[in-house]
Amino acid sequence: MKTKILSLANEEVGEITLNKDIFAVEFIRDDIIKQVIDWQRAKAMSGNHKTKTVSEVSGTTKKPFKQKGTGNARQGSLRSIQMRGGGISHGPKVRSHAIKLPKKVRKLGLIHALSEKCAAGKLLIINSLKLEKPKTSVLVNLLNKFQGQSFFIIDGNKVDTNFSLATKNIYNTLIVPQIGANVYDIIRHEYVLLSQEAVSFLEERLR
């Protein structure tokens, strides 16, 4: 499958042949894409929510008042779950929210996400992702030529330092090395920009 190679100024500078088994899958499996996104988001959850049980609440163990004669319901501890400031029954505990997903499914999810963007005309191949200076204004002017609202940019093994610094203050723009390519960011951004080096790495990784 042949497609254009563009410059950062959105000018055609050449042509590249993409692997159709990675960038042009015939039937897009949205269910697989969703599974991978759910797996990613679950794994990203911190899981550090925690409440104290009766045994963990700090306080006295003394009986608050005598058993009979006060007119109140009998109480044995100020730390009981029904008391203000007492322990919490069946509250959240620190745990991992991660779920298991086979590597083959994760790989398929990335292939189908790339194919979906390619089919929509939102996956662009860029000849070079390098800037002479880390100027945000320069990069904003270049990205404006693509007329997109958000950009997920994937470079080769290493991201250009100036380019990375220039993206820091740009809303909804993210750049990662090829190892950081993931389904969630591909789907949530309007445009996906790939360097030629990234294409080679992804085709090798997903074949």
UniProtKB/Swiss-Prot annotation:
Q: Which UniProt keywords apply?
A: Ribonucleoprotein, Ribosomal protein, RNA-binding, rRNA-binding
Q: Which GO terms describe its molecular function?
A: rRNA binding; structural constituent of ribosome
Q: Does the record carry Transport as a key word?
A: no
> Which Gene3D superfamilies does UniProt cross-reference here?
3.40.1370.10
One Pfam family matching this protein: Ribosomal_L4
Quaternary context: Part of the 50S ribosomal subunit.
**Name of the featured protein:** Large ribosomal subunit protein uL4
Origin species, per record, is Rickettsia typhi (strain ATCC VR-144 / Wilmington)
